[in-house]
């Protein structure tokens, strides 16, 4: 997967199209990511010893990786990502629009 935890992404399809958020978790087995503040769902929780009132809790649900696009930290645009190798042989991600390295 070309998106990693901590990356800034923009949603390109679905009810949250155009919104940006930070990737909280990547689920490679299902090709999904959990993005902060995106795809909010309401869970109805029954009363438990930890939460005696119960109630409705808002959580982020996973969104398919094809519905998000990485935002380049250098040019601040949503972009496709390519891979390249540095002189020392390390593989890094590269922005297709500005040709800058995305990885720290």
Curated annotation (Swiss-Prot):
GO terms for molecular function: rRNA binding; structural constituent of ribosome. SUPFAM superfamilies: Translation proteins SH3-like domain. The keyword Amino-acid biosynthesis does not apply. It holds the Pfam family ribosomal_L24. Gene3D superfamilies: 2.30.30.30. One of its GO terms (biological process) is translation. GO terms for cellular component: ribonucleoprotein complex; ribosome. Keywords: Ribonucleoprotein, Ribosomal protein, RNA-binding, rRNA-binding. InterPro entries: KOW (IPR005824), Rib_uL2_dom2 (IPR014722), Ribosomal_uL24 (IPR003256), Ribosomal_uL24_CS (IPR005825), Ribosomal_uL24_KOW (IPR041988), Translation_prot_SH3-like_sf (IPR008991). Belongs to the universal ribosomal protein uL24 family. Part of the 50S ribosomal subunit. One of two assembly initiator proteins, it binds directly to the 5'-end of the 23S rRNA, where it nucleates assembly of the 50S subunit. One of the proteins that surrounds the polypeptide exit tunnel on the outside of the subunit. This is Large ribosomal subunit protein uL24. It comes from Halothermothrix orenii (strain H 168 / OCM 544 / DSM 9562). The gene is rplX.
